[in-house]
Regions:
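Proteolytic maturation boundary segments
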Residues: 1-4, 171-196
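M16 family metallopeptidases and their MPP-like homologs
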Residues: 15-21, 51-156, 171-180
Length: 196
């Protein structure tokens, strides 16, 4: 599904999202690493391919939301309106690639190290630490130690990351929202581009 809000903006903003895994799903740790590999930092696949290599976007990244019974995986990008179709085509190609090709051990190792570093550094902040405790107490009913989470992350295999990608990146479950100076007649083309 595609939603377009025509607006006279300097750049076109897009969010490509899909329902994802709940905070209790067995593959939730693999999803965290899928997020890191695809778009959590400047070494991620989308940043390197879409921004650095092709110069299509000003900004790109992924975000995940975890809820009790579902979740969301969202890719955000900001680009020129004239580069919108190519940007979406390139993003979708990367999603198809991660479903098709197993992640190399070195890439997974770097993702685990990044995740671990971000978690531990984030918890040094008092507010972040309070949010860590409060969110778990309210949603799960108990508070896990950071080391427990990192143990689960450490056990994730390339096969599990690929399985998570195959589970969530399904063409009929992809939703695209676009804000910018894009003609309404381009919606049909955008829908076709979202087919993995």
């Amino acid at each position: 599904q595609v939603r377009l809000l025509r607006k006279s903006t300097e750049q076109t903003h897009l969010c490509l999202g899909t329902p994802a895994l709940s905070r209790f799903h067995p593959d939730r740790f693999a999803l965290e690493l899928l997020h890191v590999i695809l778009g959590a930092n400047m070494s991620s696949r989308l940043f390197r391919e879409v921004r650095e290599k092709r110069g299509l976007v000003y900004e790109i990244g992924t975000h995940i939301k975890r809820f009790k019974d579902t979740g969301a995986f969202v890719i955000y990008a900001g680009c020129d309106a004239g580069k919108l179709s190519t940007t979406i085509r390139t993003i979708v190609a990367e999603l198809a690639r991660i479903k098709r090709e197993r992640i190399h051990a070195g890439e997974l190792r770097r993702a685990k190290e990044f995740y671990s570093g971000q978690l531990l550094m984030g918890l040094e902040d008092t507010v972040e630490h309070m949010l860590w405790i409060g969110e778990q107490a309210v949603t799960v009913g108990r508070v896990a130690r950071p080391q427990d989470l990192l143990t689960h992350i450490e056990r994730v295999t390339p096969q599990q990351v690929q399985r998570a990608a195959r589970r969530i990146f399904v063409p009929e479950r992809l939703f695209l929202a676009v804000v910018g100076p894009v003609p309404q007649q381009q919606v049909a083309t955008l829908q076709q581009l979202c087919a993995l």
